[in-house]
Regions:
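A short SAM/SAH-binding and catalytic strip from SAM-dependent methyltransferases
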Residues: 165-178
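N-terminal auxiliary segments of SAM/dcSAM-dependent transferases
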Residues: 2-54, 311, 322, 328-359, ...
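Class I SAM-dependent methyltransferase SAM/SAH-binding core
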Residues: 86-94, 98-156
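A short acidic, Gly/Pro-enriched loop at the edge of an enzyme's catalytic core
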Residues: 155-166
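Conserved alpha-helix/loop element of class I SAM-dependent methyltransferases that forms part
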Residues: 51-90, 104, 108
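A short glycine-rich, Lys/Arg-flanked "PGG" loop and its adjoining helix->strand segment in the class I
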Residues: 180-195
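Short, glycine-/aromatic-enriched active-site segment of Class I SAM-dependent methyltransferases
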Residues: 202-222
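C-terminal lobe and adjacent flexible extensions of AdoMet/dcAdoMet transferase-like proteins
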Residues: 238, 244-249, 255-377
């Protein structure tokens, strides 16, 4: 089989023994320096890639006011990683930085849940740890801890396999030198039916090799970004058979110098959800199944947005593919739906499944769900 230049290197640590390992470590050192010393706040960023421009939902705004300002000002995320129905969950945040998302999620999981943050940058973790006791007083409970480590080496941390309900990450996976190892580690830690819900940066094509070694473009979350279709391939190879796009927005490279370097490359911030369910197929198949949302998820009494192509109205029986049926049936959302049908019959490919660029190219608000029944992907 003929190898495709650029595909493997963007997904996994490059082969080559000691030299490749040294190169990966050099990249990690540059990332540590960029986020530990070069940047002192989100105002120092030179693009919109690692700074979320999307509106925070009204229900979450009061929770952000309970997070310390020194934590908030060191936030470099590119999306929102707070999915529905989090009460009592055990959550892992990859590349947690100074801890904004950890402290936000800590309030959502409540005293009966736990949030663990992992980061390799000592300066960022120092900020997170400094205010851990302060946040426990604010919330009335202590349910947070932080670990120093690399997200490619999750097996080296004191984390029990199959012990997490949810893994999140916010504009960090693109900075990894071995994205395949990250996904493998996540799958190992998720319980059956658990979910990886993460926002990251993607490109409309493979980033040229010279740009992938540019320290500023890498630190700004651009040159480490995967071509979107390579990400889908990598996710499927890692056991996440059907990645679901939740929302996306185009990114603006407004710095003239960086814009000149990136040229025609188009970058997007996108949020995906990936479920750890063995029975998922590699395509959306039609088994004549349907679901009806009960309207019982807090904050979603009228409808529940599941991904970019699924918005479930309360009480409406909605035809779905076998994968969507399983994602709802085998996950924490099962109690909020009524399920119709099974897998005893097959009617072919579910209508609307395609393979074109999934992101919305026009600038503006983050792209939300399409009309119900418009297909799965």
């Amino acid at each position: 089989m003929t190898a495709v230049p650029g595909m493997a290197e963007q997904g996994a640590g490059a082969p080559g023994g000691g030299a490749a390992a040294a190169g990966d470590e050099a990249i990690r050192d540059r990332v540590r320096t960029y986020y530990g010393a070069t940047l002192s706040s989100s105002a120092d960023l030179r693009t919109s890639a690692c700074c979320d421009a999307t509106a925070v939902p009204a229900a979450l705004r009061p929770l952000l006011t309970r997070i310390h300002p020194q934590v908030l000002e060191r936030y470099y995320g590119c999306g929102l990683v707070a999915p529905e129905q989090l009460q009592g969950l055990r959550v892992l945040d990859l590349g947690c930085g100074a801890g904004r998302d950890v402290y936000l999620l800590a309030q959502l999981v409540g005293a009966g849940g736990e949030v663990v943050g992992v980061d390799m940058t000592e300066a960022q973790l120092a900020v997170a740890e400094t205010w851990r006791g302060w946040h426990a007083e604010q919330f009335g409970f202590a349910n947070v801890r932080f670990l120093r480590g690399e997200i490619e080496q999750l097996h080296a941390l004191d984390l029990e396999p199959g012990s997490f309900d949810l893994v999140v990450s916010n504009c960090v996976v693109n900075l990894s030198t071995d994205k395949a190892a990250v996904l493998a580690g996540v799958r190992r830690l998720l319980r059956p039916g658990g979910e990886l819900y993460f926002s990251d940066v993607y490109c409309d094509r493979r980033v040229p090799e010279p740009l992938r070694h540019d320290p500023v473009l890498y630190g700004e979350c651009l040159s480490g970004a995967l071509y979107w279709n390579d990400f889908l391939r990598l996710a499927r190879r890692s056991g996440f058979a059907d990645p679901r796009l939740v929302s996306d927005r185009p990114l603006a490279v407004t710095d003239p110098e960086l814009a000149a370097r990136t040229g025609a490359l188009r970058f997007f911030s996108a949020t995906y959800r990936l479920f750890n369910i063995e029975a998922l197929e590699d395509a959306c198949e039609d088994h004549g199944q349907a679901v009806a949302y009960r309207g019982t998820v807090p904050g979603a009494a009228e409808a529940l947005v599941f991904d970019k192509h699924h918005c479930f109205d309360t009480g409406r029986i909605t035809p779905v593919c076998g994968n969507t049926w399983l994602m709802l049936r085998e996950s924490r959302l099962a109690g909020h739906f009524d399920f119709h049908g099974d897998f005893s019959r097959h009617f072919g490919l579910f209508p609307g499944c395609g393979g074109s660029l999934p992101f919305s190219p026009a600038a503006g608000p983050a792209a939300g769900p399409a009309a119900a029944g418009s297909g799965c992907c």
